[in-house]
Each structure stands twice: as C-alpha cells, then as structure tokens.
C-alpha cells in the first residue's frame, strides 16, 4: 500500500487494468465466477506467507475469510506452482465437497486443474519489482486487490490463450516446436500445417486440427455461454460379403456395418460445434447407459473441434453407444 501510494495514480490504474485484462477465464461451471459477495471463502496458496497474508487482508472487503475449509462456501486454491501443496489444497476441497476456484497464478493451466476446478482463472501478469530490486516484500504478479476484484466481479478477465496448451507433457514434447496448431496432431496433419505455413508466411494456421487441451485465442467471459452441438458420429465399420441365390443364379454384394472386436480399443470421432461464446464441456461416451470414457473439450466461440476418443467394449453382442447427444448401434464380435 505504501508503495502504491508513492506511485503515479495514473500508472497504478493503467497497470491494474492490464492485470485484469490479461487474466484468462478458462472454466466456469454453472457461472460460479464472479463469486457472490458476502459468502464464506477459504483460501489456500502455494505463494509465500507474505503474499497469502496480503490476499487475506483484502478479501474481507468482499467475503468472510474462514480458517477452516469445512466452514467455507467456496475454496480458492491459488497455485503459483503445481506441487504437492497445491494438490493437497485441491484434493482436500474435493473431499470436503466444496465448490473450488483454482487460480493458475503465473503458471500454465493443465489437465489436472481443469478436471478438478469448478472455475479456473489464469493470471498471466508479471512485472519486475520497482527499480529492479530483488529484495523481499514485493509482489511482482497480479496484485491482491486485483486478485479479489477478479474473483468477485469488480473487474473482469479479458485475456486469451496466446499459445495452445497441451493435454500432458508427452503431448507437448511431441509438438514440432517451429509449428503452430499441432498439439496432439498426427504426423499427416503436421505435414499439412507445415505446407500451409510454407505456402504463405502470413497464412493463418488452423487452430482446431490438433487435440490441445486449450486452443489458441480461447478465453471465456463472465455471463457468456457456449452453445455446443454434436454432429457426425463416426465409429469403426466392417465390410461383409453377402451371397444371394435367386432363380438358379448366385450374386454377391457387400454390406458395411458398425462393428469391431471385443476387448480391442477403437476410436470414435464426433464433430463438436460451438455456436455460442468460448466455453468448455466434458464429452461422455456412454455404452448401454454406462459412462465408459470422458474427454474435456474447450472450443472457441463460432468454431468447431473434432473429438477423438479411444474406447473399448469387452462384451460381444449389439450395444447402444452414445457420444454426446449422438447415438448408434455397434456390433461387438469375438
């Protein structure tokens, strides 16, 4: 506070605006954010004790801060790194059945955060300490007051993902580092993207040909809703020879049916359109009423993505398989 009072008010205001506008809303189930003022919150953080105390100093202007997670309406997990301490906060909140807001504070969101958070906010702002000092006592990321304003709606996140995010480290390692848009893509798609880049230096590479966790330019807004539509479910097929006898002659034809082998993994594909604003959903594959696989999909507004799911059905026979809102009958053979 003393430092802020000594600085030019216009610079402070501009910097705080930048902090808010560079924040990215990744997930917001049931419009949990912004939080309602006056609720009871528990905050856990992997930041320094000084930073955590700074948060606890400003949060009472917006909510009641409780020291026992069991007493909270909402748990806030401020993650400056993804370590055992961060996972402990998250797992404790889930075990307690609490609504959970995860703040990815100057770190990339990952699949674990997305899967466990009810709401996920990424804070990307960072600056050197005044005069370049490395002395303790300086918060060089998003200020506590802006942190609280973002959570409770006095400021709104307006940022977007500037580089697509991988689903896991193995996917990120497999990415061609000089190629955009290829997280999770197969080699054929990578060659297509490379050819497009070489055709024109200014060519815009598609951001939905791969299988990233989060697409380039993704960023949700408070109150804005996605509108997901499922289209064109593709399942494995088998071709069978059909021999027909008629009037003493034999004819051969072929029929293709949705079929695969028991216990052998197969891939289901579906197009997922988003006719609304940027948003996220969990696509479920359901066999005979039982969920057999799930996949998190974030889709930019007005865009589409191909959902690719590896499935296995062990029991031979005919089964009803649904992916999202689309359903087909699939035959499983020995």
What does each of the following model-derived ranges do?
Residues 1-317, 324-334:
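Preference for extracellular/luminal or secreted protein segments
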């Amino acid at each position: 506070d003393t430092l802020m009072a000594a600085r030019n008010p216009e610079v402070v205001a501009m910097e705080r605006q930048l902090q808010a506008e560079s924040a990215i809303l990744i997930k917001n189930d049931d419009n949990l954010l912004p939080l309602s003022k006056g609720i009871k919150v528990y905050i856990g953080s992997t930041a320094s004790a000084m930073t955590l105390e700074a948060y606890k100093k400003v949060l009472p202007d917006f909510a009641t801060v409780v020291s026992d997670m069991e007493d909270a309406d909402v748990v806030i997990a401020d993650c400056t790194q993804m370590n055992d301490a961060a996972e402990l906060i998250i797992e404790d909140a889930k075990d307690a059945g609490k609504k959970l807001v995860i703040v990815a504070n100057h770190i990339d969101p990952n699949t674990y955060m997305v899967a466990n958070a009810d709401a996920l906010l990424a804070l990307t702002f960072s600056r050197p300490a005044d005069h370049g000092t490395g002395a303790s006592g300086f918060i060089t990321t998003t200020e506590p007051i802006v942190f609280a304003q973002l959570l409770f709606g006095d400021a709104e996140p307006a940022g977007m993902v500037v580089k697509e995010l991988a689903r896991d480290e193995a996917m990120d390692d497999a990415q061609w580092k000089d190629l955009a848009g290829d997280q999770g893509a197969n080699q054929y798609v990578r060659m297509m993207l490379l050819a497009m880049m070489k055709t024109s230096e200014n060519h815009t590479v598609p951001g939905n040909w791969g299988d990233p966790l989060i697409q380039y330019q993704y960023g949700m807004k408070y109150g804005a809703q996605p509108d997901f539509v499922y289209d064109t479910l593709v399942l494995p097929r088998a071709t069978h020879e059909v021999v027909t006898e008629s009037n003493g002659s034999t004819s051969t034809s072929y029929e293709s049916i949705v079929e695969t082998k028991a216990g052998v993994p197969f891939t289901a594909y579906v197009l997922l359109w988003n006719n609304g604003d940027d948003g996220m959903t969990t696509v479920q594959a359901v066999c005979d009423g039982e969920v057999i696989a799930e996949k998190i999909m974030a889709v930019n507004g007005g865009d589409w993505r191909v959902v690719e799911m590896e499935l296995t059905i062990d029991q031979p026979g005919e089964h009803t398989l649904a992916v999202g809102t689309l359903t087909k009958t699939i035959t499983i053979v020995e």
